[in-house]
Amino acid sequence: MIQHMTRLKVADNTGAKEVGVIKVLGGSKKRYASVGDIVVVSVKKATPAGLIAKGQMAKAVIVRTKKSIRRESGLLIRFDENACVLIKEDKTPRGSRIFGPVAREIRDRGYTKIASLAPEVL
C-alpha cells in the first residue's frame, strides 16, 4: 500500500533513483495506491547526468509493491520493494529501459509499453 510520503525506487533509466509520493491520483479522497495506479512524485535522489533532476515533480505508475496482490485465481504475489516507473502525460514511459520484474496487472491496466520493456512480467 503506497500512500502520501512513501519512498519508492525508480525502475527505469531516467536518472531518478528514489522518489517520494506527493499525491495518489484517482477519486476525491483516494488514500492508497497499488500496482497499476498513478501517483504524483517528487525526485529525492538522482544521478547527475540524467533526464530528471532532484526536486523535479513527475507522474509515475506503481509496478512493484511489498503489499501482496491477490489475483482472481487466489494467487498472492508480492515483491521485495516498492518501485515505480516515471511516465509522460500520455501514459508512456519516460525512460527507454525498465529494470526488474513487473506485475501482470500493469498490462491489464493498459500499460503495454511498460510491460513490453520489462525483462519479466509476473
Curated annotation (Swiss-Prot):
Transmembrane segments: none
Xref: Pfam families: Ribosomal_L14
Record keyword Ribosomal protein present: yes
GO molecular function, one term: large ribosomal subunit rRNA binding
Keyword RNA-binding: yes
Cross-referenced SMART domains: Ribosomal_L14
Any single biological process term in GO: translation
Entry GO terms, CC: cytosolic large ribosomal subunit
This protein's UniProt keywords: Ribonucleoprotein, Ribosomal protein, RNA-binding, rRNA-binding
InterPro entries found in the cross-reference section: Ribosomal_uL14, Ribosomal_uL14_bac-type, Ribosomal_uL14_CS, Ribosomal_uL14_sf
Quaternary state and interactors: Part of the 50S ribosomal subunit. Forms a cluster with proteins L3 and L19. In the 70S ribosome, L14 and L19 interact and together make contacts with the 16S rRNA in bridges B5 and B8.
UniProt cross-references to PANTHER family, sorted A to Z: 50S/60S RIBOSOMAL PROTEIN L14/L23, LARGE RIBOSOMAL SUBUNIT PROTEIN UL14M
Protein role: Binds to 23S rRNA. Forms part of two intersubunit bridges in the 70S ribosome.
Family that this chain belongs to: Belongs to the universal ribosomal protein uL14 family.
UniProt name for this protein: Large ribosomal subunit protein uL14
